[in-house]
Amino acid sequence: MNKQRHIIISFILTSLMCLSLTCSKLSAQENILFTNYNNNKLFINPAFSGSTPYMEVSMGYHKQWTGIDGAPKSAIISAHAPLNNRPVGIGAMIYSNKIGILNETGFFANYAYKINMPKNRVLSLGFQAGMVNKEVRWSEVTTYDPNFTGDDPSIPNMNISSIAPNFGLGAYYTTPKFHLGFSAPHLLQNTYPHEKDLGKNINFEFNDIYFYINSGVLLNINSEVQAAPSILLFSSLNSTTNYKFILNFSHINGISAGGSFRSEKYWSINTGYEFNSKLGISYSFENSLDKLKRGDHTSHEIFLNYKISLKKSSYTSPRFF
């Protein structure tokens, strides 16, 4: 009981520390965030690579604000695994995000080095490198002026894209019942191009780097049910601090359910089922607390996760939620 109380206190203190972050000014940079980020922590922290004793392959799709034309649509495929007999994890992911005529596609390779500690505690230090393609599809612009001839010099008559590198860093500390992560998955700012010039579409501004802090605990309700509260905060020095709180419950028969709330005043319901401890499927429904937004601000998300058994490694890293 004392151990579980210590875990709860650690989680509360971490959450309060995170909420004390203060920032100013809104940033124009968009951030992709899945409703149930626990389905793919690799997307926000490269140190999560190889944090399970098995290889994990994940696929997810998120459709935001279903009642609004040009609303964000995101998809991701990722895989990560530990290397046998080495304190190393590797991973890779490819994702896409579409908002109106703006398209972003990214590919990243991940590496994590694990420092094993007593009592199954692990500190992972991660790095990722990849390429991000930004595209503006001017060909999809629809005009409602019958006199428009398409000769407006301010609107290009062709799609414009640019590809540039990006890098990320992260740290991930875990125990069998607690985890705490800190990361900056994109150290550079890949901007949408106005012209085909690589040098003008990549920047480094420390104040615009988005930092992520996530923490969670695993609590035994009884011999069959576990609760997993977790919190995620993300911000740059030039933006406000956003947070998301998730509370999920899981049963030993593979069923899971829960909900979440995020600072932009959105709530969600999460459900899932795991087949034979290998294949898992989850669905999330999100909506706004604002009555004026409820009709067209609903979002849907689905994830598939598949676990592939590996040869037992001498290096352990517990699995969370």
Where in this protein do the model-derived segments appear?
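Bacterial Sec-dependent N-terminal signal peptides
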Residues: 1-31, 247, 308-310, 320-321
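Subset of outer-membrane beta-barrel
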Residues: 29-321
